[in-house]
Every structure is written in structure tokens, then in C-alpha cells.
Amino acid sequence: MTDIGPFGLVILVIGLVGTAAVLSNRLSERLRVPAPVFFLVCAAAASDLFPNLARLSHVTVQRVVTIALAFILFDGGMHIGWRRFRSAAVAIGWLGIAGTFVTAGITAAAAHFLFGIGWRLALLLGTALAPTDPAVVFSVLGRREIGGRTGVMLEGESGANDPVGIALLVALLAATGSPAAAAGHIAVTFVLQMAVGAGIGIAGGRLLLEFMRRVPLPNEGLYSLRVLAGVLAIFGLATVARGSGFLAVFVAGILIGDERAPYKREIERFHSSLASLAEIVAFIMLGLTVRLRDLPIGNAWSIGLALGALLAFVIRPVFVGLITLPIQLRRGERLFLLWTGLKGAVPVLLGTFIVGSGIAGASRAYEIIFVVVAFSVAVQGGFVPTIAHRLNVPLRTIDPEPWSLGVRFREEPEGLHRFRVSRGAPAVGTSIEDLPFGEDAWVIFLIRHGRLVPARSDTRIEAGDEVLVLADPAEVPALKKLFTARRSGHRHTERRPAGASARKEPTTDSDHTGT
């Protein structure tokens, strides 16, 4: 038998690093510094101290981060869901596409005219730095959740501009010939990737949902693995068909997010954990592939810091801000949305594409991307809570609820509905016996501040309560009106952000607890 000591040491190191990465989220909450900062800095320092760690090829990083990003986008799509996405679909699409093009163009112009970078490399660099990452924002906020339209826009913009940025970079890398021919090729390639990706995402999401509903499996754990395999299949099919696999899995996640299916909660928890792991892996990969001692060479430090500052203080607030003017947002919400365009895992992936292209100066561009991402996460991310408070962005603190009440049903419980009581709803202050229910409706459970409250006849409903009601499905519209405040202006819901928790907390839509 061969000596397994070295292999055991590798496993031990991986386990310790993983534990440290998870615990860093707790430290991040205390210091108000995004957890990805620790991943970046520690990995970069480790690559300097242990040169063998820096021998990862960019192809390896590209493949690993590609898979990681696919899971991140699918989880993000599930947490948005179709109902929330539909309420802001036009705004999300407009900001995701137009915002990406404007950010890429202005950043490329700044890189060319201010720092003398050639036009082709500048365009690639600008495109790589265009996508945003709301998961970094949510890691800074910790247990505080963004409410209203702002939260939907943050998640939706990132899910939209990630595939757009990737498709645009791929089109730029494939462009050859005269400027006119290259522009035409870029346009055709981009439109084809978007159309094919969206089409396969819709079809694949529907097929996967039917598969989840109609084909029972012998083991509970297999349900989550089936969805994981489905995500990989959708991504692979879209990629083989010359479409955007990232857009395909994001769209599939949106379609599945609001739907009912067996073991849906377990599936959501599994993919939320998988997305968190994927984000950790992506940032560690970026850190390991950059050596801090090499950054001063070629002025990567100074150029990266300058571009990071321009993106944070000029390009996004001013130029992307003009794009948001047609979108109905309060002034504070608009400013917060513009500040929170943080950079994350996608620039890592796009940087590996640039290096893999073999274009002159690609390694320098990758180092610049590292500095910009580090600046964005540390500086912009560090001020997110303060700016949210100053701009009166709606936030609510989510206390941890580690204990769950598991209830299993053999058949789909169509008559069991869950509602979160909105502030100002007609039911607030009303005792259970005085609720204007029909004869066939009963309050089964009442959950308040994470604790079970006896559902007695004299128990009064309070804002924020979770109410489980047994009623005929036809009663659902009336029940929604009873537990939901009448709002003026845009309609919005609140739900946990991607990566924060897999348990959903709808405010205006019923959630069937047996699914």
C-alpha cells in the first residue's frame, strides 16, 4: 500500500482553509469588511509565500470559475423568481444590457486615453470590468436584507449583466478583419448568444421543472443532485449550441424559483450553499493566480486603483446613472443602486479569457482586474452599510432561525398556504376569531419573531407574523388582501438575497409550505 500521508496532508489543508473561509464571514460581519476581501488577500499572500500554489494554469482557473459561476447564477435566478423578476423585467433588462455596454465603452476609453493601453486590450479590459456582483453587497450587509425595488434591481442587474458581459467579451475575442466587419461579427455573435441562451434557458427550465414534479426518486438527497445535474446539462447544451450558458441557467433559475415541487426547500438550501462555496472558490482562485510582488511591474497597482476609483465615483454614478433615469426609483434608491455596482467573480473569469487569448499585455490586464476587484470589494463594499443608512434604503434585520419545523406530506398540500403579514395590512391588530375568513379557512400556525405562538381565538395578528392557513385555493386572493398592506406606487416583495439563506420569506405572495 502506498504512503497516503502527503494526500492526507492536502485534505487537511483544504479542510482548514474551508473552515477559515466559512468563519471569515463571521469576522466580516464584525469588521464590516466583505468576506471576499479575506479570500483575495489570504490567497494572494499564500501564492507569494508558497510559489507552488501559484502554478495553477489560467485554463484550470477558467474551467473551475465557469462551473462556479453557473451555480451562482442559477441560485441567484431561483432567489429572484419569476414574480419578482416580472415586476421589474424591463428595467432589469435595460440596465443589464445598456449598462454593460456603457460601462465597457467608457472604461475602455479611460484605459486607452489615460493609460495608453491599446484599443483592443482596452475594450477587453473594459468589458471584463463591466459586470457586477450583488453577492458581495449581501455579504457586507450580513443579516440585514434590502427591501423593495432596490433589492430586486440589484439581484436582477447582476444576473442580466453577467451573461451580457461574458457574451460581449467572447464576441470581441472572436472578431477579426476590418473594423466594419469586426463590428458586424460582434453584433451577430452577441445576439446569437443571447437568443440561444434565453431560448434554451426557458425550454430547459420548464423541462427540469416537470422532471422535478413528475419523476419521483427513492432518496431525498437525490432531488437536489438531480437539479444540479440539470443545471450542468442546461449550461452545456446552451454552450454547445453557441449560446450563453450563463444566461440559460439564470433564466432557468428564475422560472423554477417561484414554482412548487417536491423537496423544493431542500433543493433551495442545497444550491444556496453550493453558490456560497462557488463564490469562495472563485475569489481564492483569483488570489492564487496573482503574485502581489509582481503588481508594481507595469503599473498594475496604479492603473487598477485609478480605474477602480473611476468606476466607483465617475463611470457608474454619472454615465450608468443617466441610463437609470427612465427607471422609477426614489433618489436614495437610485444612488444606492449606482454605488453598489461591486465587482466580483465574473471579472475573474473574463480575465482568464483575456489571458487565454494570447493577446499582448494580457497578463498585465489580468493583474489590473485583480486590483480593481480588490478595490471595489474593499472600498466600495466597506461603505455599503453606511450609505444604505444615509440614503434611507429600506433594510430589515433577519435574525438567525436555526430550528425548523419539518412537516412532510404524501400528496401535494394544495390547501396549505403561508403568508407574512405586512405592516399596515387589514389583519394587523385583529384577533384570529375576528378575521374575515370563510367557513372553510383556519389558522393552523402563527410564527412571531422566529417562535411558535399558540393560535388561540383571542390571539391578535401583528405585522411581521408568519401565518399558516388551511383554506381552499380559491380563497387565496382574498387572503392575500387580508395579510398585505395596500401600497401606492410600485409593488414589491422582500425575499432573502442569494447566498444569505435558502428559506424564502414572501410578503405578498402565498407560499405553499408542503413543497
Residue ranges with predicted function:
Residues 309, 417-422:
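Short, glycine/charged-rich beta-strand-loop motifs at protein surfaces that mediate ligand recognition
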Residues 396-419, 489-505:
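Long, charged amphipathic helices and adjacent flexible linkers at domain junctions
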Residues 459, 479-500, 515:
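Short, compositionally biased
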